[in-house]
Design a protein with these regions (language model features):
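Beta-propeller folds
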Residues: 3-5, 9, 19-343, 350-352, ...
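Conserved hydrophobic/aromatic "anchor" residues
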Residues: 40, 49, 86, 389, ...
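Non-catalytic accessory segments flanking enzyme active sites
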Residues: 192-195, 298, 307-407, 432-435, ...
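Short coil/loop residues immediately preceding or within conserved phosphate-binding loops
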Residues: 26, 35, 56, 81, ...
Length: 646
């Protein structure tokens, strides 16, 4: 494949690259990306792009051809645009979310998702679920698209009210005329997912009993719904992973019967029998056909390499040719045409950062479409290298170290940046936050501490009961390792994190003292009992997997366990000896804003240095450009004041 670079003119145009004599402006990293998603239409003739000007979002439809004309656009302004997908050649489905408390519902504000159909021929848009009686106009996840007798249909999971009780329900929506039909009501137990066949029939239900912690799989055969699998899963539903390889089977992740540390992918036939997909214990993500109708491959993280496996040999060879066209870069499939011959890929260059490219397998050509971050140049991208070290108890910890560009990697100031979750993980992909900090002269360590996902179930379980304990010292063990290597100056280290990473930052100031000069928590839990109690209230006192999950990870026997206070930064505020920065969005529905106000009050009462920055109208995920940049600017100012890079 020959690669040619070409600009991509959009309504919100790609900013030309600029060479910065000094560090790039923080806005290069902190504002919303130039492009958040690129989807190619089924016939490959058009592109649907979710673009931004750094704050406002817009859907732009353009012809795929170089210099192709504008086909349509929708301005979403400050609305949080979450996903874009084609439904044939004339319809684009857009998913958005907002933080709200609908009229008539009790409880705290929550994040609600809505889906729209944009007709690129008529230029009209329509809210899915808009006119359905006895149902909310929200969706519980992205729609599935199927064609029935040439007509595009959207299949969405919605909420149908029966006697004032909301019940998850599968709906079928005719995108040609808007007609909506309730396809499956889910039954008595909580049905949390469906698989839909290519011809638009429900194949399977995923069900989860929150009280008992039982997950079950129901498959629809000739005699109706039959429960074919039932598993105890106290920490949450196993769910469905889509349709299987033949388009009629269904997929679910299960613990391997022969090795409890492994999770494998089972493929269930309509008679309830199943096979285990070969090598699926190595899979991190699945690849379905462009229309979602069948499983065609998987993605595995092997070391730091993202490897694609396609079950069809020709498709596998085609992907190998795509990757070969971008030597030295990390290549990810973003979208592809129905015939799988035109692909949009995200190309993550360790030198230039991420960009989108269009690959035409028939023409054996590829061209760049647009950079992901406007104004980001080679001078603004720092080197990321994998590291590996032993924790104090001998457990191997992996992670990533970002080294500031142009600096000798010796005696550097360090920022420890633990990920959220905590059942999540960091990867070597471009990370705007760590790159921004590196651009200011800091080395940045992102460890995959125990409890992180992607390293086997035993590694996750190693984190149970280790909040503020071994999960915390896994971070400081990384500091000691880098200090021993001479890479960083152990007297110039701060810790910064969001969500669980925010908790880890506060625990670094209260529980694992003497390691850090300052700590910044963004939306971090601080009073763990209050945090879990607030989650439990959503279920009105009923047993539930959410409460069980948090108590398991925190190592508490129940909501009244006094050990929660010993690992809660709020209760340990008097031990703080370093400056603390707290940043929190007012619209956070995951870790409530009150968690940071409680911590600020406790620190002030103890006479400790603290600053609280409130992000107006911001959620847990830093979805807005202005407040995302406000967060980043506040963190950098705090670091430069308390841990100067020079």
């Amino acid at each position: 494949l020959a690669v040619t670079t070409a600009g991509f003119a959009m309504t919100t145009a790609v900013m030309p690259g600029a060479a910065w004599a000094e560090a790039p402006p923080l806005s290069v990293y902190g504002r919303l990306p130039n492009v958040e998603q690129v989807e190619i239409s089924p016939d490959g003739s058009k592109l649907a792009l979710s673009v931004t000007d750094g704050e406002n979002r817009m859907l732009v439809i353009r012809e795929t051809a170089e210099g192709g004309k504008l086909v349509g656009a929708m301005n979403f302004a400050s609305t949080k645009l979450r996903g874009v997908q084609w439904a044939g050649e004339e319809h684009v489905l857009v998913t958005t979310s907002s933080t709200a408390q609908p009229h008539g519902l009790t409880g705290p504000r929550q994040e609600y998702w809505m889906a729209f159909d944009y007709n690129i021929v008529t230029k009209k848009q329509r809210l899915l679920m808009e006119n359905e009686k006895e149902a909310m106009n929200v969706v519980l996840g992205a729609p599935d698209v199927r064609f029935i007798e040439g007509v595009p249909y959207a299949f969405v999971k919605g909420v149908h009210f029966v006697d004032n009780y909301g019940q998850n329900t599968l709906y079928r929506i005719n995108l040609k005329n808007g007609a909506t039909r309730m396809l499956d009501g889910g039954g008595d137990e909580d049905t949390d997912g469906w698989a839909v066949s290519l011809d638009g029939q429900p194949l399977a239900q995923s069900r989860y009993d929150e009280k008992k912690g039982d997950w079950s799989l129901r498959i629809k055969g000739d005699k109706g719904w039959v429960t074919t699998e039932r598993v105890v899963s106290t920490l949450g539903s196993l769910g469905l992973a889509g349709v299987g390889r033949d388009g009629r089977s269904v997929l679910s992740w299960m613990q391997d019967e022969g090795d409890e540390d492994k999770t494998v992918l089972r493929e269930y036939a309509q008679d309830g029998s199943y096979v285990v997909i070969p090598d699926s214990a190595k899979f991190d993500n699945l690849i379905h056909a462009p229309d979602g109708s069948s499983l065609v491959g998987a993605i595995s993280l092997v070391g730091d390499d993202r490897r694609y496996t396609f079950f069809d040999a020709k498709l596998h060879a085609s992907w190998a040719a795509v990757v070969k066209a971008f030597p030295g870069d990390r290549v990810s499939l973003a979208s592809w045409s129905a015939d799988k011959r035109q692909l949009v890929v995200e190309v993550d260059s360790p030198v230039m950062g991420p960009a989108y490219a269009l690959v035409d397998l028939n023409a054996k050509s590829a061209r760049f479409l647009t950079d992901v971050y406007r104004g980001l140049t080679e001078e603004g991208v720092s080197k990321v290298q994998p590291i590996k070290y032993k924790a104090a108890d001998g457990l191997e910890i992996t992670g990533y170290l970002t080294l500031p560009r142009g600096k000798d990697p010796k005696n550097l100031p360090l920022v420890v940046l633990p990920h959220g979750g905590p059942k999540s993980r960091d990867t070597p992909d471009f990370d705007w936050w760590s790159q921004a900090l590196a651009s200011r002269g800091y080395a940045v360590l992102r460890p995959n501490f125990r409890g992180s996902d992607g390293f086997g179930w035993a590694f996750v379980e190693a984190g149970f009961g280790q909040w503020g304990k071994a999960m915390q010292t896994d971070l400081s063990d990384g500091v000691r390792y880098l200090a021993k290597q001479g890479t960083i100056d152990p007297k110039r280290v701060c810790i910064v994190g969001a969500s669980y990473g925010g908790y880890a930052a506060l625990a670094g100031a209260t529980l694992d003292r003497g390691v850090y000069r300052c700590a910044a928590s963004i939306a971090g839990p601080a009073d763990l009992k209050r945090f879990v109690v607030d989650k439990d209230r959503l279920y009105e006192g009923r047993a539930n997997s959410t409460t069980r999950f948090w108590l398991e990870f925190m190592g508490a026997d129940g909501l009244k366990d006094p050990d929660l206070a010993t690992i809660s930064p709020v209760q340990q505020a008097g031990k703080v000896e370093i400056p603390v920065l707290l940043i929190h969005g007012k619209d956070d529905t995951v870790v409530p804003y009150v968690q940071s106000t409680l911590m600020a009050d406790a620190l002030k009462k103890a006479g400790k240095p603290v600053e609280l920055v409130t992000l107006p109208s911001e959620d847990h995920w830093l979805s807005r450009g202005a407040t995302r940049l406000q967060m980043l600017t506040s963190v950098v100012d705090f670091l430069e004041k308390n841990n100067p890079p020079n």
